[in-house]
């Protein structure tokens, strides 16, 4: 079991604001000292989500900040995210844990 996440946990969501892109939000947050970044976009096409999430994942790795993907276990695995955040209608926890492995965050 992973330890609890503490500190400032940022969720990038361009559906609740349209002034900044996911990437701009992540860059500003990293510069500001954020502790965790979660990529969240429920409407984006898979190929576009992959490109953006992969870029943010690399930025987070360089900054030693955990990167979480919202809802999408497939995307989390594809970009080697540190974890996945599951909602009520997403893949069941047991299956997500099996796919993600014991060293990743599943919540």
Label the predicted regions:
Residues 1-91, 98-106:
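Conserved N-terminal beta1-alpha1 strand-loop-helix module at the mouth
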